[in-house]
Design a protein with these regions (language model features):
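Extracellular/virion structural assembly segments
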Residues: 1-156
Length: 156
């Protein structure tokens, strides 16, 4: 099994499979953050454009696919996902959610991704048992919204 780890806010770094029941399947194959577009200007009497070659890294989304072992009962997967999602934010009296910054360590692809998570809201696939009746495994996709790419490291 491929090991990936997660730190929520300033908490302890934990293995996603043993701690949350999320077994790593795949993730984006990103070697660097995208760059913001170059600033350009052009004039009708001038051929081409003027281009300022200075730019910085831009925000991006990092997608991770996990499977959740349901052990023949979809309710088990629902409970694991709900428990995981509840760790990602705090909620005030008015039901406003404030998301915590997460640090995702993809030891397989040697990347450290820092950003704000989107909760897991739906399954991408259900894998059934050999009789086609029970959901043994539920596949989900999780997104980390990277707002400050300078915190990420693509060579850990």
């Amino acid at each position: 099994m491929i090991k990936v780890r997660l730190q929520i806010a300033d908490g302890e770094i934990k293995d996603t499979a043993s701690e949350y029941g999320l077994v790593y399947l795949s993730a984006d194959s990103r070697f660097a953050a995208p760059i913001k577009g170059f600033e350009k200007s052009s004039y009708p009497e001038q051929p081409g454009t003027n281009l300022d070659p200075k730019t910085v890294d831009d925000e991006f989304e990092y997608k991770v696919k996990f499977f959740v072992k349901a052990d023949g009962d979809l309710e088990n997967a629902n409970q694991k996902i709900a428990a995981f999602n509840s760790l990602l934010y705090t909620k005030d009296a008015d039901n406003v959610k404030t998301f915590k910054q997460v640090t995702f360590y993809n030891d397989y692809k040697k990347a450290k991704i820092v950003g704000y998570p989107t909760p897991i809201a739906e399954a991408t696939e259900f894998w059934r048992d050999s009789r086609g009746k029970q959901a043994d495994v539920v596949c989900v996709e999780w997104t980390i919204n990277v707002n400050n790419p300078t915190l990420c490291d693509f060579n850990i």
